[in-house]
């Protein structure tokens, strides 16, 4: 069974965790931005009837 030779440092662990968190934040911000543009009718990435509001 493969075993790591040395322990991962706390700073490296923190950096990796922050990268993982920032990816989630970016995805959430993008989703929120898209929802905002859909609700105002300014979306350029969706085709279809613009008068149909949910």
From Swiss-Prot:
Source superkingdom: Eukaryota
Main subcellular location of this protein, as a coarse class: plastid
Localization of this protein: Plastid, Chloroplast
A single GO cellular-component term on record: large ribosomal subunit
Matches recorded under Pfam families: Ribosomal_L32p (PF01783)
GO terms of biological process kind: translation
Keywords: Chloroplast, Plastid, Ribonucleoprotein, Ribosomal protein
Disulfide bond residue pairs: none
GO terms of molecular function: structural constituent of ribosome
Family: Belongs to the bacterial ribosomal protein bL32 family.
Protein name as annotated: Large ribosomal subunit protein bL32c
């Amino acid at each position: 069974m493969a075993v790591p030779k040395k322990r991962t440092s706390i700073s490296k662990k923190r950096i990796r965790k922050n990268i993982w968190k920032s990816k989630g934040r970016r995805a959430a911000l993008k989703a929120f931005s898209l929802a905002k543009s859909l609700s105002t009718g300014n979306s350029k990435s969706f085709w279809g009837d613009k008068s149909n509001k949910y």
